Each structure stands twice: as C-alpha cells, then as structure tokens.
C-alpha cells in the first residue's frame, strides 16, 4: 500500500481506509494490523478514522497508539523542534501564532496521543538523564504506560505493543498516575485531572454537554474565563448513582461514552469520578470550575 510521504493523514484517509478494506477482502481477516508512520506523523490525524469509522467497525478497531522515543535526543526535539521546523511553522500560521511562547512540536503530539511510550536507546544516557526524560514525558502524558529499552528490543509484544485494548475500558489503575494533578515540567503540553462526585441521571446529560462544549466548540461552559486550549486526549471514569459506571474516551474532537462491562465484578459503582485531559492549556483552573458549574456542584 504506497503512501505519499510515508504516512496517512486526513487528506487521504478515504484512500487509506479503502486500501485496508480491499486488502482484507482479498486476503481475509488478519490477526493484527500494525500501521507504522514516519517520524513526523501526527497521530491525532490518523487515530479517529480507525477508531470511529462505522464501515470498519465489524472487523477493525483501534487497539492503541505506541510512540517510540529516542532517549538521547527527545529533549532537544521537545525544546527546539530540531528537524521539525516546517511543521512548527505550519502550526504557527494556522493558529496565528506570533512566534513567541512554547513550541508545539511533532514530538509533543506523538507523546500526548500515545497509550504506550517506549523510551529507546537508554544505553546512551545516564540514569539521571533517563530520569529527566521520563519525568518530562510523564508531565506531557500522565496516562501512557512507559517502557525503557535498548536497540528497540521489548520483552514481549502482547500487552506492550499488541493487544493493548486501550479503548475498551478505563479503570482506576489507568488514571492512577494522572490523578496526582497536572505538572508544569513541559511548557507546552500537560496532563490535568478533575475529580468530582458520583453523578445522578440528570447530571450525566450535563456531563455530556460539558464534553461536547470543550471538544467541539473549544470553549468552556457558562461564563468561566479561559485561555485558548487544545485537547489531544481525554479519558474519564464516571460512577453513576444508579450503579452504572460510564467510561469516556476522546481523541481530538471525537469522543464516545459507554457503560463499563462487568460492573458488578469491578465493584466500583460508587466512588469518585475522574476526568483526565491531555493537551495544550488544559491545566487552567477554569476547566474544573466550568465542569462543577455545569453539574450544579
């Protein structure tokens, strides 16, 4: 399947989907489809077409996003955008950026969208440097699982690169690291967690209204002042007083909320709800105030 510039993006998504459908019709079902992008690809442009495309729903689903990080050079990529100048300039023009302030590099986008992050070439850095890299990555994406390797060798594929089921459910363990709050180690992208009480039925609709507003309209509900923001990933786990547990997943402006399976086994029909946001400007206090005002808390 030849791809222009080595990647699939929004401008050719119909071609990419049709090519995979045609391949499966000719060769039958595959156990797994691993789509490898170039080093300058934006996962946010690719993931939604596999995650929510109804035409592929019966045979293909998005299992997860894996990002490979160069331990030796990733900080340089995040801080100065080395090798990413053209994409950075395009983003600045699209957002009418004046050239000042933190850079939004492709490295930021690839880390912020990931479900698993593999830090490679760890043999080329010291323990202190590796810790700095790990903390910087964690500040950008507090939800992703992080694994360190040398020469891209991972101990096993299943559960780390394959069979992630990253969009099937959201557990307390998934949100554990992010629940400590947001970090300011990276000036561009942050992970922020909002906690709130168990919802009643009426508040469930209000919660959905809040999600639609921040993702589709890129604004906050009510009259809460805010600075411009950009949400890359969203995960939520919301217990409801009637015993249900709702899980929410989002990539860019697309999201879905489903009822968790096996709630009785999980034993978590009650308790604290959590909403985790990853993106640009998501660490402002206005998000929490807007959600609480919308829910009437």
Predicted regions located by residue number:
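Nucleotide-state-sensitive switch-loop elements of NTP-binding domains
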Residues: 1-105
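Residue-level preference for the first positions of well-ordered beta-strands
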Residues: 31-34, 116, 274
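Cofactor-binding loop segments of dinucleotide-utilizing enzymes, especially the Rossmann-like FAD-
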Residues: 70, 151, 280
């Amino acid at each position: 399947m030849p791809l222009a510039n080595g990647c699939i993006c929004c401008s050719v998504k119909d071609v990419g989907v049709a090519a995979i459908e045609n391949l499966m019709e000719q060769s039958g079902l595959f156990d797994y489809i691993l789509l490898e992008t170039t080093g300058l690809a934006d996962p946010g442009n690719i993931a939604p077409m596999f995650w929510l495309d109804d035409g592929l729903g019966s045979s293909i689903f998005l299992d997860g996003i894996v990002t490979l990080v160069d331990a030796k050079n990733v900080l340089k990529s995040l801080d100065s955008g080395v090798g990413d100048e053209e994409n950075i300039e395009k983003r600045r023009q699209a957002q009418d950026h004046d050239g000042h302030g933190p850079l939004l590099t492709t490295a930021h986008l690839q880390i912020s969208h990931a479900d698993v992050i593999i830090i490679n070439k760890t043999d080329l850095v010291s323990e202190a440097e590796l810790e700095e890299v790990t903390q910087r990555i964690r500040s950008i994406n507090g939800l992703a699982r992080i694994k360190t390797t040398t020469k891209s060798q991972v101990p096993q594929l299943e559960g780390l690169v394959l069979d992630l089921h990253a969009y099937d459910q959201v557990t307390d363990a998934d949100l554990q690291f992010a629940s400590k709050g947001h970090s300011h180690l990276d000036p561009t992208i942050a992970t922020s967690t909002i906690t709130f009480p168990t919802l009643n039925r009426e508040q469930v609709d209000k919660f959905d209204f809040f999600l639609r507003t921040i993702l589709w309209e890129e604004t906050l509900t009510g009259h809460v002042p805010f600075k411009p923001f950009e949400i890359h990933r969203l995960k939520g786990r919301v217990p409801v007083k009637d015993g249900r547990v709702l899980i929410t997943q989002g990539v860019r402006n697309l999201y879905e909320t489903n009822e968790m399976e096996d709630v009785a086994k999980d034993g978590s029909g009650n308790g604290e709800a959590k909403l985790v946001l990853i993106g640009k400007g998501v660490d402002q206090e206005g998000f929490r105030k807007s959600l609480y005002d919308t829910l009437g808390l």
